[in-house]
From Swiss-Prot:
It comes from Drosophila melanogaster (Fruit fly). Residues 81-96 have a biased composition (Basic and acidic residues). Its main location: secreted. InterPro entries: INSL3/INSL4, Insulin-like, Insulin-like_sf, Insulin_CS, Insulin_family. Possible ligand of InR/insulin-like receptor. This is Insulin-like peptide 4. The gene is Ilp4. Belongs to the insulin family. SUPFAM superfamilies: Insulin-like. One of its GO terms (molecular function) is insulin receptor binding.
Amino acid sequence: MSLIRLGLALLLLLATVSQLLQPVQGRRKMCGEALIQALDVICVNGFTRRVRRSSASKDARVRDLIRKLQQPDEDIEQETETGRLKQKHTDADTEKGVPPAVGSGRKLRRHRRRIAHECCKEGCTYDDILDYCA
């Protein structure tokens, strides 16, 4: 009887130690609405520039953002090529004194795609999401 109690105590100790050694919160895969909600909760100052609008337009913005987050890689590559062409045009404009606004916007859009890829495909941690906050 004492041997059974000793075995159960060791089993309980082993289970407790194994739970303590696991990371508290590892990488979690979040896509679409779940990713947007995580960004809203974690990013106090927002993850994009926000303008208060009516709830109908907010729903439209959420749907648009979800569509962009779920956009296939081929579309992303095509937009990147288009962005490069715009960037060349912007470089010529810079010589004339026009600020390079097109390239800046392109960089911001690609940044949002990276968090979608990172969190949806590979999983991300709290610290990863915090890096994308404004």
